[in-house]
Structure formats: C-alpha cells, structure tokens
Amino acid sequence: MENKSVDLSIIILNFNGQQCLEKLLPSLKNHFLSKTSFQVEVVVVDNASTDESVDFLKTFDWIRLIESEHNGGFAYGNNLALKNNRARYVMLLNSDTEFTDEDSNLDRLIEYMDTHETVGIITPKVELTDGQPDRACHRGEPTLWAAFTYFMGLEKTFPKYPLFATYHQSYKNLKEIHPIDACTGAAMLIRSSAIEKVGLLDERFFMYAEDVDWCKRFRESGYQIIYDPEVKIIHHKYKSGMGNSSKTAKSNATYWFYETMQQYYDKHYQNQYPGIFRYLLKLFISFKREK
C-alpha cells in the first residue's frame, strides 16, 4: 500500500442532508483539514438526494463528489467510494457528525494505525449532541446472549459484569484506548490494505448492521478493532440518511435497526443456538420492529 498517493480519504455519505453538511463541512475544514500533517481528501457520495444537497456540495472545490443514480443504502453508497479508493486509510463519516476544536485530531488515529499493523479499524469516541456517549461506537459482538441481556435490561442493571454487559462492553475502562468487537459506521477509520483482504461492506444490509457485520469480518480475518477516547467526534444522531423530522427519522431508524438485526442473526447465527431461542428472539424483534 506504500504507493497510495493519499494518506486518508474521508468518505461522507449524504441523503437529503444539506442542513447537516452545513455544520459538518466547516467544522471538518477548520478543526482538522487546516491542521493535519497528512495528505487528506474528502469524498462525498450523494445517495440520490431530492433536496439541494448536490448544488450545495458543488460550491466546495476541495470535495470530490460522487453522485449515485439511486439510494441503495449505507453500504451501497459507501462502496461507490471504496471501489475507487486511492488512500492508505479511509474514514467513513456520517453527514450528521461534527468536529470540535481540540478533540477531533484524526492525526492521532493515523499515527496509531501506522505503528500497529494488526489494527484494521480504529474509532474515536463518539458523543451525542447532549454530551452523552454514543454507545454504538463501543460494542461487543451482538450474539444472541448479548442481545438477550441488553434487551432484558440486564446490561443496564449490571454494567460492570462481563457476563451481562457484553453488548456494549461497558465493563471496560472507557477512558483508555483498548480493543473492542465493533464500532459505528458513523465514524470509523479503516486500513485500506485490510479492506482488500476482508472485502467491501455487505450491500444486503440497507441501513444499520453493515458496520457490525464488517467489524466481525475484520476480526475473523485477524485484525483488531480499537477504541481511542482521546479523539472525539460529535454525532447529531438520527439526522442523516432520513430526510425527515427528528421524530420520523428516529421511528424510521428504529424500524431499520430491528429489520437488519434480524438479517444479521440470520447471516451469522442461524444454526448456532437452539431453535426455541432463535424463535423467541425473532418474535421479540418482530414486535419491536412493528411497535
């Protein structure tokens, strides 16, 4: 990968997210691009937006714009850019994220990857708008047992016990850098040479679960996934990829979360648990999805 001409390619997927981009792009420019010591490019994939996003994006001469003919989902859109990647590392970044002045130094993540060749993915600490952690950036493998303990409230009751808190691995020290099982596609930095080995995102997942699926495939290929709390990105959650009000967007997000959760378990755990356990989980997911 030494012949790559760019150190980092930041891939931003957009669907009707002009208002989000109006906040993200200046923060990215001011708080990272103007300070970094690395060669960085910014690629925005527009997933067939129906708002004025494309016209807005064309006003930025430092952005490489890819226009999709249709909205094929998160994996499909990001893969359009990944297929033409020319950087040593890529970062998937939601359009509803924001960089901060002191904490969003991606150089630290690149430097860590440069000195740790077994790391395939590294994620910053992702905070929600209210300052609370976005727990999706720090996850364990969502086995059926992990899902059961999470949805039954056992993780919340016993957050420091590994047996009951594997879904978000809340028993680990969140103030220190350490390995995790999975992170969120809202902000993840990936080694390009590892993608060549692992493969692209699974486009059968329209939205959600494709990041967890990718992380699982990275781990199965021998790569580590690292969480670094010293780097922070703000996530204004449920604002990207929906094109609706926050309430409607959250409702849509909930539906797709449970829809793709079922896909994930069908893909990876179809024959690994007793039939009755899989049946009960499927009933629960169906109930939550339609609620």
Which positions does each model-derived feature cover?
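Conserved donor NDP-sugar-binding/catalytic core segment of glycosyltransferases
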Residues: 101-136
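Active-site-adjacent helix/loop segment of glycosyltransferases
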Residues: 216-291
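N-proximal low-complexity "stem/linker" segments adjacent to membrane-targeting elements
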Residues: 1-30, 38
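Glycine-rich, basic loop-to-helix element that forms the pyrophosphate-binding segment
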Residues: 67-85, 100-102, 108
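A conserved acidic beta->alpha catalytic loop
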Residues: 18, 27, 44-54, 70
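Short aromatic/hydrophobic "clamp" motif used to bind/position activated sugar donors
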Residues: 90, 96
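Short, flexible, basic/aromatic active-site loop/helix in glycosyltransferases
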Residues: 141-180
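A short, conserved alpha-helix in the catalytic core of glycosyltransferases
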Residues: 173-200, 204-232
